[in-house]
Amino acid sequence: MMPMNPKQLKKLMKQLDMKQLDGVKEVIIKLENKEIVIKEPVVTVIRAMGEKMYQIAGGTEEERVVLKISEEDIKLVMEQAGVDYETAKKALEEAGGDLAEAILRLTDQ
């Protein structure tokens, strides 16, 4: 591909109805069991056939596992350890969702 000067690039972007979003700090793509976090990306919005498409490029990528903790699990930890909702939830998160580990951590304090 031949290099383009900035003026030609702006003209082409206008013809394709492309606009760059400024000030984007991060983009999070949420999957069923994890999140992909792209920090400091370059995000371009493209309009074609009545649809908006977002192109995300560059940046630092990290994956985070999303832990799903059920209300039943939180209530069980609350009852067994004699703690409030937030304490039980935090203990479950720290224990990676392991009920026994969360209860042991709370009762061994």
UniProtKB/Swiss-Prot annotation:
Annotated InterPro entries: NAC-like_UBA, NAC_A/B_dom_sf, NAC_arc, Nas_poly-pep-assoc_cplx_dom, UBA-like_sf
GO BP, sorted A to Z: protein transport
Superkingdom of the organism of origin: Archaea
TM region positions: none
SUPFAM superfamilies assigned: UBA-like (SSF46934)
Keywords, in A-Z order: Protein transport, RNA-binding, Transport
The keyword tRNA processing belongs to this UniProt entry's keyword annotation: no
MF terms (GO), sorted A to Z: RNA binding
Any Pfam family matching the protein: UBA_HYPK
Domain NAC-A/B: 3-69
UniProt record similarity statement: Belongs to the NAC-alpha family.
Function: Contacts the emerging nascent chain on the ribosome.
Binding partners and assembly: Homodimer. Interacts with the ribosome. Binds ribosomal RNA.
UniProt name for this protein: Nascent polypeptide-associated complex protein
Organism in which the protein naturally occurs: Pyrococcus abyssi (strain GE5 / Orsay)
